Amino acid sequence: MAEVPELASEMMAYYSGNEDDLFFDVDGPKQMKCSFQDLDLCPLDGGIQLQISHEHYNEGFRQAVSVVVAMEKLRKMLVPCPQIFQDNDLSTLIPFIFEEEPVFLDTRNNDACVHDAPVRSLHCTLRDAQLKSLVMSGPYELKALHLQGQDLEQQVVFSMSFVQGEESNDKIPVALGLKAKNLYLSCVLKDDKPTLQLESVDPKNYPKKKMEKRFVFNKIEINNKLEFESAQFPNWYISTSQAESMPVFLGGTRGGQDITDFTMQFVS
């Protein structure tokens, strides 16, 4: 039986020598050519076309068989697909790599995450509907009075922090601390009555995203005026008196003799 020569013998004589353009010729000039660049071997069922030059009909059987062997070897060689791999191609592979499973979040134990959340704050001053400013009256009390000129420097600057609470379209939960002081407005029950007070806190722990409910007020905006409703005692509001230099307190009526409307001025 006749032995078919390997590619390294006769076929190398017809090899072009260019790695980027591999082809085999029957004889001399490129009469018959099979280039890697011309073959897209990505489809497994794709065939290879073999072009025969009839001018070389007198070539020997060994050379003809060598060409066929070379073509078969080229056909079996793994040639990269020229198509560029894109992001959408990766998305088709993900379902085969990862298995989708539902994730259940236990919201009962998320206090630590809420505590670590950053707190957004701003500095501001507040004046009631009669343009009375809020100033300190003793170490733990605020009062409302009219200020003018240089006396305006006496008014309290609040650090308003946006905290966790029952937020809605018209209510934004906030905490009201005094700037540069470890004091926060809080609502507690004294003598069976909701009462407003200034409470001292540890600056290492305050402000925080999840404040205790006694520190939380629902900021409500109505006709460019602000109201501050106690989250601990609904329908009770930060209030001032019609009279001058009276303490700021927690009142249970709106639109009556007590003033519950305020304007806010931002402070840099």
UniProtKB/Swiss-Prot annotation:
An individual GO BP term: positive regulation of immature T cell proliferation in thymus
Chain residues in the propeptide: 1-116
A single GO molecular function term of this UniProt record: cytokine activity
Protein role: Potent pro-inflammatory cytokine. Initially discovered as the major endogenous pyrogen, induces prostaglandin synthesis, neutrophil influx and activation, T-cell activation and cytokine production, B-cell activation and antibody production, and fibroblast proliferation and collagen production. Promotes Th17 differentiation of T-cells. Synergizes with IL12/interleukin-12 to induce IFNG synthesis from T-helper 1 (Th1) cells. Plays a role in angiogenesis by inducing VEGF production synergistically with TNF and IL6.
Lineage per the UniProt record: Eukaryota, Metazoa, Chordata, Craniata, Vertebrata
PROSITE patterns noted in UniProt: INTERLEUKIN_1
Cellular localisation: Cytoplasm, Cytosol; Secreted; Lysosome; Secreted, Extracellular exosome
Pfam families to which the protein is assigned, alphabetical: IL1, IL1_propep
GO cellular component: cytosol; extracellular space; lysosome
Keyword Secreted: yes
Site feature: Important for interaction with integrin: K171, K179, K181, K190, K204
Principal localisation: cytoplasm
Organism: Macaca fascicularis (Crab-eating macaque)
Gene3D superfamilies xrefs: 2.80.10.50
Keywords linked to the UniProt accession: Cytokine, Cytoplasm, Inflammatory response, Lysosome, Mitogen, Pyrogen, Secreted
Note: IL1B production occurs in 2 steps, each being controlled by different stimuli. First, inflammatory signals, such as LPS, stimulate the synthesis and promote the accumulation of cytosolic stores of pro-IL1B (priming). Then additional signals are required for inflammasome assembly, leading to CASP1 activation, pro-IL1B processing and eventually secretion of the active cytokine. IL1B processing and secretion are temporarily associated.
Record-stated family: Belongs to the IL-1 family.
Protein name per the record: Interleukin-1 beta
